[in-house]
């Protein structure tokens, strides 16, 4: 006999009309917004359409572009916010507000510090994972990409099975990072780097199982770390709860109506709603409206 899976985390909390400070729609990196809000003293609720937590983040490579960040500084990358600003100005070329790029750069260090305080995530520099356009002013072939070190998903305890599975689940556990893939792909040409890398990750994965650990990497590690942080501070998550519509008082957003178990539930959000549910990239109409009218012409 199997026990039905609870639609809430923690289990047993009621799904009913409620009032919070901030509503987060989507349980991928929206969990980072939830943790930030919690640190600011706000009450937070996360709603997730599927039965799993992690969203598309858990199925991604989990890489973060973190220019002039503490991670790069600790590894002697020699990057600066000024160089990163020059690069963004070169590649974005006026297609987005300059203040948006400036705000991103201004908050990189704060974001890294927040992840370190609130989650078990530990980031490393994916050295030589080049910027997409290293030839542009401010670009760098050494790259500014950072990624999660392999993380033991067993820290989620009873909620480990609620983490969205990765795209490529294999029978042999081998938590592989982006940096690892580089040498694995070049193993035929550079076996002295490829073989030790494979042995290291295979040993970590199989050895971890023997010790009761379940290491994950990439987006799985990022999602698991954020999930662990959310569970630790008790931010509630409603799974199997899809956004139906936003509510408004005519002047501003006041919350949302979500569908759960065949009924509608109203969540009033005093400070706002964060839409982190993904799907935007699948709507060409929205992409043309909010990104560029020329998308899809070539």
Question: In which residue ranges do the predicted regions lie?
Answer:
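Residues forming the flavin
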Residues: 2-84, 123-127, 132-137, 141-298
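Alpha-helical scaffold segments in soluble metabolic enzymes
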Residues: 36, 87-90, 103, 110-117, ...
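Short glycine/proline- and acidic residue-enriched helix-loop micro-motifs
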Residues: 88-98, 206-213
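Long, well-ordered early-domain segments
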Residues: 92-134
